[in-house]
Amino acid sequence: MGKVLIVIDMQNDFVTGTLGNKEAQAIVLNVQAKVKEYADRGDWIIFTRDTHEKNYLDTPEGKKLPAKHCINGTEGWQIVPELEVENCEYVDKPTFGWLNWEGFESNDEIELVGVYTDICVVSNALILKAKYPEAIISVDVSCCAGVTPEKQAAALETMKSCQIDVYRQEQ
């Protein structure tokens, strides 16, 4: 059984940039501690990066969320510097959820943290649960932020309903 940490979209634009909020800023130290915990054990760490091109505003998503963000190669697209570690992997995803998760075993423990709980975290948690129904999928609330506290609460309830283990690690 392996342990995997997936850090969802902890990018500059979602923390301090175009779409950042105080909730996202408040979890950076918790996520940093979580990444260090996994790195110290030599566990598998994957960072996802929301990745858009310069024509983002012309896309269906860009028309519904007309805020240019996470444009490939820009400063806003980069992972928050405090979180970078060696021996990690990156997944550049063009939308909320990544459909091509591979390499996990049915008995793995897969933990998700990051932003935004009500968009990309919930999307990826549910995709992983559908693809690996026997894996233990968990979300640490102390390392997640929603667009709003209300939307985060709704997403957490949805994940609990779908047998995602939602917990809060004391820091």
Where are these regions (language model features)?
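Histidine-anchored nucleotide/phosphate-binding helix
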Residues: 33-37, 120-132
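Active-site beta-loop-alpha junctions enriched in small/polar residues
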Residues: 50, 96, 142-144
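Short, conserved acidic/polar surface loops in the N-terminal third of protein domains
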Residues: 56-60, 101-103, 123
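Internal catalytic-core helix/loop-beta-alpha segment
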Residues: 69, 73-121
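Glycine-enriched alpha-helix->loop->beta-strand junction motifs that scaffold or abut catalytic
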Residues: 112, 132-134
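Phosphate/ribose-phosphate-bearing ligand recognition and processing surfaces
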Residues: 114-123, 138-149
